[in-house]
Amino acid sequence: MNIIEIENLTYSYPAAETPILQNITLQVEKGDFLAIVGNNGCGKSTFCKTLNGLIPHFITGDFSGKVVVDGVNTLEADVGTLAQKAGYVYQDFENQIVRPTVLDDASYACLNYAMADYVERGKEALALCGLEGRENDYIWQLSGGQTHLLALAGAVSLRPEVLILDEPIAQLDPGHADRIYQVLKELNEKHGKTIIVIEHHTEYIADYCKHVMLMRDGNIAWKLPTSQALRRVGELQECNIFPPQVTLAADKLRRQGRLPWEQPLPTTIPQGLEAFRGLSLIHI
């Protein structure tokens, strides 16, 4: 079952000479964990903003084609309705924090929808995002990673089936980055949420994502299972996307004749340990 269906999507910003998105057609299955990669300016963030209706309802321009998210045509619904279909955590997530305490902020969206159970929804979202017990804390008491989780909780409180995160670990240390992705993994695997991340940290993509979509010049170059995608070393590097270090090491060994060409490149550490078993790596 597809949770997202896009047909012939083309979009241009006002006064732009050329479209930033060009004739995109895509299906995303319910329960997928999709990473979107590509170089700067290829249209990743613009594309994702069509999924929650910011484009074209809030950000105007020339829009054509069809975008359906969880059964709703984005052209036929307002952004308030679409926020309950596709939650979005932006790269500048601090701007999504608007209330002084943790529970106030997590439940604020539901309060604005006049939901009678807004407090319960906020508490539920905080628990799902690993912030249970922090309800009465002030937001300034949170770390950067916890603040990011709070922004995610605000989106989760509306119970959308799709969650979109733009560069979720760009400002975080490895410990908090791991925590963010563990929360996303649980939301995906235990609660059936479809997760879409704009990401360039390919080690995290390898460990957590099910599919990878490469965007280039406003088009989708391909969408592939993660292992297949990350093995396209040269193509990714052309787009300034660096495959996992274990993949790059194996690719170099293969070019040196020390790994067979028919052996698939490893994309995770466990795969690398198996691939490199018995090799002397002194000369890598």
Across the structure, where does each feature detected by a protein language model lie?
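ABC ATPase NBD Q-loop/coupling interface
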Residues: 66-81
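Conserved ABC ATPase signature
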Residues: 138-142, 146
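Conserved catalytic motifs of ABC-family nucleotide-binding domains
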Residues: 159
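Conserved ABC ATPase "signature" region
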Residues: 116-134
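H-loop/switch region of ABC-family ATPase nucleotide-binding domains
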Residues: 199-200
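Conserved beta-strand-loop-alpha-helix hinge in the C-terminal portion
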Residues: 219-246
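Catalytic Walker B motif of ABC-type/P-loop ATPase nucleotide-binding domains
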Residues: 163-166
